[in-house]
Amino acid sequence: MELKIVSSEIIKPSSPTPQHLRTHKLSVLDQVAGDSLFPVILFYPQACSNDTTKTSDHLKKSLSETLSKYHPFAGRFKDAFSIDCDDSGAVFVEACVAGEMSEILKQPKNDLLEELMPYKLNEKPSVPVNLAAKVTYFGCGGMALCVCFSHVIADITTAANFIKSWVAISRGFSTSNDIPDTFFDCSTVFPPQDFSSFSRNAFADNHSQSAEIITKRFTFDGVKLADLKEKIRKESSSGYQPTRVEAVSAVILGGIMSAEKEGEKFNHTNLVPSVSVNLRNRTNPPLPELSIGNIIQAAITKLPIEKRINYSKLTEQLHGSIRSIDDEYLKKFHAVGEFMNNMQNALIALFDPNNRGFTISSWCRRPLYEADFGWGKPIWVSTAMKHKDVAVLLDSNDGKGIEALVALPKKEMDKFEQDPGILAYASVDTSII
């Protein structure tokens, strides 16, 4: 795919940040997030006429208005504890491709998706922005919009809320004045810590990028997923009905266990999944849904790597670890003087040589497929990644199935694809159209 950069510029907020909102305090959850940008990529089959300039101008104007409500995304890091919301702005890149968008949608490979990003996955931006967008126009009239968010101040809920607000302003349904204030000082609930002895990325080293990492997309269609959930329910001693995410996670973890057992060196005795949990509705009182930040915490459990994979057992263990993260748990975990000890214990479990860590992040049930800027809803929403031992789960475009992006070492990916559960319930890198 031959892509040409047409322009790159800084988009500043349409109105200055009020003085009392100039400093955005980071919570400890923001501090321990990986210092990287994560992409949300939306594909529109008929997004523009021949006048791409008009489309870009419309996107830039509405982005400017949206930034006036999401002040940290136009700011810059001041120190390890705060962002200066100084209206420096966000990056907006415009690109074009002579070819058809269908070339990507028929075989959506990770390296092709990476080309649609304003920066490569392992690239450090020359300008230290917290948000960067790139619009790519195809010769067929289609368009891909990639929005990259700093993981320090955004989880997928924050990202989805930002895109939703951008859409509303773009369509004229709202102005920046209509959007509720998005600020909520999460540093009072999850107090920041002094991590001066090591970098923010110390917590992300287990998922370092590597050329040997392969990312593939596994699609669990709605019919097979419903059958899987029912099978798990029948096999469960308690009759527990798993969620779609729990069922897919169990199959993925089962595949990891199978790949471990088939490996040349079977060094791990336990699989330690780390499942990202949205904390907004788990505190008492709940945090506002529009809270800005990386307001997630990992539910960690230790699973013995066994010869016989039992999906009902896996889902119940996952469900138990997720359910345990409630207000009482969070208050104890983040109590004064306790956080560092609790975090250290979690890291010891993840980096124990007998344990194999694996991260699961669910983007399901976010309104990403509702992002209609005026030219229809996206035909596909995805992301790109190269982090080792990570799975990102997204809704399929029909809303019934789940697409799982799984990143593994190449040799292990070959074994993972041949796992009986993966073969039975998932299709690999299938066409979107």
Swiss-Prot record:
<dbReference type="Pfam" id="PF02458">
    <property type="entry name" value="Transferase"/>
</dbReference>
<dbReference type="GO" id="GO:0016491">
    <property type="term" value="F:oxidoreductase activity"/>
</dbReference>
<dbReference type="GO" id="GO:0016746">
    <property type="term" value="F:acyltransferase activity"/>
</dbReference>
<keyword id="KW-0808">Transferase</keyword>
<comment type="subunit">
    <text>Monomer.</text>
</comment>
<feature type="active site" description="Proton acceptor">
    <location>
        <position position="372"/>
    </location>
</feature>
<keyword id="KW-0012">Acyltransferase</keyword>
<feature type="active site" description="Proton acceptor">
    <location>
        <position position="151"/>
    </location>
</feature>
<comment type="similarity">
    <text>Belongs to the plant acyltransferase family.</text>
</comment>
<protein>
    <recommendedName>
        <fullName>Epi-neemfruitin B synthase L1AT</fullName>
        <ecNumber>2.1.1.-</ecNumber>
    </recommendedName>
</protein>
<comment type="function">
    <text>Acetyltransferase involved in the biosynthesis of limonoids triterpene natural products such as azadirachtin, an antifeedant widely used as bioinsecticide, and possessing many medicinal applications including anti-tumoral, anti-malarial, anti-rheumatic, antibacterial, anti-inflammatory, anti-pyretic and diuretic effects. Catalyzes the formation of epi-neemfruitin B from (21S)-21-acetyl-1-hydroxy-apo-melianone.</text>
</comment>
<comment type="pathway">
    <text>Secondary metabolite biosynthesis; terpenoid biosynthesis.</text>
</comment>
<dbReference type="InterPro" id="IPR023213">
    <property type="entry name" value="CAT-like_dom_sf"/>
</dbReference>
